[in-house]
């Protein structure tokens, strides 16, 4: 039996990960987690949400972190942590930081990634459009967002594409960089590639435009993208043409990443995330 607080806590997706670092997986089905023995691990009371990410987002904090956004102000402001978008400790469900305090709206989208090489730890932002924040709780990183076609803010998924330690945004068949990067000769928020040029469609689901699938299939840490064709008759697999001087093991050898890629289209699509920390301040060029 569960207390009434556990009712209606599920999200439009769920994650399987070793939340409490005991060598066994737990089930995170939204605002609550079930331990490996079937018992209650924790419940935040935040209620239902659309976005749910689990990974290592804070370099010097032990364990994994969760970034999630929530639909129901009555829950996340009432019995929950009080923010529309939150960074949560995966071990106990405790609040690390958040934004959208006292929000009265459905926060339908959020994303987490290391997109700014000048800011330590990962960044996260949401459809509240209050800014790009640090997962560590150190506050606002920037009021400038990753933007795509037509200037819309990007919340879809993050991808290793350009061969850099930071990630780019993958949204509506486009890979877009955030900050100027002379190593790939691109400027702020410049489109790196549009897969539609080669015959793909813009993605699945007209409000999200997700790829069919993406991940590190070839084993060189840069990720490949699977898209349907514009005529819906073919499947395309795209691989980056950007060289890299950085080296990482095949990302799918990391259990957290492997689970995240396997579950990315179980419900609403969620991006891939590693279970160990890789950021611009830690990943060095190969000698």
What kind of feature is each model-predicted range?
Residues 1-287:
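Beta-propeller-forming repeat regions
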């Amino acid at each position: 039996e569960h207390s009434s607080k556990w009712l209606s806590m599920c999200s439009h997706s769920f994650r399987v990960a070793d939340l409490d670092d005991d060598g066994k997986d737990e089930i995170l089905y939204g605002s609550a987690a079930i331990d490996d023995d079937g018992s209650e691990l924790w419940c935040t009371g935040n209620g239902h949400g659309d976005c749910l990410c689990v990974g290592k987002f804070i370099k010097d904090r032990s364990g994994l972190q969760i970034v999630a956004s929530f639909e129901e102000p009555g829950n996340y402001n009432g019995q929950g942590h009080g923010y529309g978008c939150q960074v949560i400790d995966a071990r106990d469900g405790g609040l690390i930081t958040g934004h959208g305090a006292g929000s009265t709206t459905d926060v339908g989208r959020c994303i987490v990634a290391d997109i700014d090489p000048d800011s330590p730890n990962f960044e996260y932002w949401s459809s509240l459009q209050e800014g790009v924040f640090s997962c560590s709780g150190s506050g606002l990183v920037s009021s400038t967002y990753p933007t795509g076609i037509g200037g819309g803010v990007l919340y879809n998924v993050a991808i290793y594409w350009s061969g850099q330690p930071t990630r780019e945004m993958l949204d509506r068949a486009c890979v877009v960089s955030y900050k100027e990067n002379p190593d790939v000769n691109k400027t702020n928020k410049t489109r790196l590639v549009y897969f539609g040029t080669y015959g793909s469609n813009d993605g699945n689901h007209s409000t999200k435009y997700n790829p069919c699938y993406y991940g590190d299939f070839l084993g060189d840490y840069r990720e490949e993208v699977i898209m349907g064709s514009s005529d819906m008759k073919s499947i395309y697999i795209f691989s980056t043409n950007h060289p890299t001087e950085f080296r990482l093991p095949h990302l799918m050898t990391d259990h957290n990443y492997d689970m995240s890629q396997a579950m990315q289209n179980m419900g609403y699509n969620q991006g891939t995330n590693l279970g160990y920390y890789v950021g611009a301040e830690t990943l060095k060029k190969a000698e």
